[in-house]
């Protein structure tokens, strides 16, 4: 996938639905977006034991992943509806931070025990990452070793998560759809090769490619002269990312020690300013639903359409006031 492109996620959903129609409950989904410690909450989500707000809160969606949840909502809703297992693939942030800071060679023996088996010797993989640094990170060539280490950590960890599941009693003989960024599957040297090294299971890769017109430009990642490999088994052409307008109140919030959400700043000419909100107001609920954190407010607003209204209850100097916004 291209994380922020809705068209890529529509491709994923289409493939998921087709697989479900053909294979029923013998499929499972793996998602880069979740780190392995949050697996219990994915299980609870699929089982229908927690609602969406609780699910997003417990998996720390906004701080852990950060992309718009509504890009992924249809996939996760379908998994819940059909009881399709969703497997958390990614490495915990603490491990990533540790390797990013010290590199693999700078870790103690105790620290290395927390990691999967990691192979950083693929020269084509390294060439791809070096190009990414050169094109996207100004004057960062000195960080190539650590960047290579972190990328391999992510991919080895996700590969190990996939193999762990497919080797388990519940994952045995299942068809597995792994949803991850294009950079982790292109040319096979990321997740695909690392899964195969561990399991020798057959696989296909599908690369959703963004470009204008009928043909990609020659400098596209799919056609790198320094990497004489097939970029993917299938390339699915999708339209380029289109910036979408977001529904917003127009406030900057801060969560205080007593868990109250206090307005720190109001955007000029925003819905909040027009409604009469003031800096220092405390937002307590929206349409009767308690707002416990910024993610609650953001995700609720994304359910709205342009032209809709909502009732926001605020607290000002000990008095509760309701505004129609």
Each language-model region and where it sits:
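Zymogen propeptides
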Residues: 2-24
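PDZ/PDZ-like peptide-tail recognition elements
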Residues: 225-268, 303, 324-325
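Extended hydrophobic/aromatic segments used for targeting, binding, or gating
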Residues: 187-233
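Conserved PDZ fold ligand-binding element
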Residues: 272-294
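PDZ-domain C-terminal substructure recognizer with occasional recognition of PDZ-binding tails
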Residues: 278, 284, 299-325
């Amino acid at each position: 996938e291209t994380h922020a492109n809705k068209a890529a996620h529509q491709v994923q959903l289409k493939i998921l639905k087709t697989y479900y129609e053909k294979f029923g409950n013998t499929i499972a989904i793996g998602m880069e977006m979740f780190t392995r410690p949050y697996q219990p909450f994915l299980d609870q989500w699929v089982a229908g034991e927690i609602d969406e707000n609780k699910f997003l809160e417990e998996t720390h969606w906004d701080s852990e992943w950060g992309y718009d949840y509504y890009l992924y909502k249809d996939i996760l809703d379908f998994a819940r509806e059909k009881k399709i297992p969703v497997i958390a693939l990614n490495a915990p942030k603490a491990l990533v931070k540790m390797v990013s800071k010290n590199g693999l060679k700078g870790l103690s023996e105790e620290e290395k025990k927390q990691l999967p088996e990691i192979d950083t010797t693929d020269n084509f993989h390294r060439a791809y990452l070096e190009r990414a640094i050169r094109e996207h990170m100004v004057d960062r060539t000195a960080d190539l070793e650590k960047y290579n280490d972190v990328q391999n950590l992510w991919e080895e960890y996700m590969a190990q998560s996939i193999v762990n599941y497919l080797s388990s009693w519940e994952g045995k003989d299942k068809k597995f759809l792994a949803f991850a960024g294009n950079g982790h599957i292109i040319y096979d040297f990321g997740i695909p090769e690392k899964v195969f090294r561990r399991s020798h299971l057959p696989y296909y890769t599908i690369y959703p490619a963004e470009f204008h017109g009928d043909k990609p430009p020659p400098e596209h990642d799919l056609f790198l002269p320094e990497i004489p490999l097939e970029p993917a088994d299938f390339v699915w052409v999708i339209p380029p990312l289109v910036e979408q307008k977001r529904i917003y109140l127009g406030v900057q919030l801060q969560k205080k020690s007593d868990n109250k959400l206090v307005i720190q700043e109001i955007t000029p000419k925003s819905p909040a300013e027009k409604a009469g909100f003031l800096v220092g107001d405390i937002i307590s609920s929206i349409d009767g639903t308690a707002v416990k954190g910024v993610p609650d407010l953001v995700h609720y607003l994304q359910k709205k359409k342009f032209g809709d209204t909502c009732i926001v209850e605020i607290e000002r100097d000990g008095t509760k006031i309701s505004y129609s916004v």
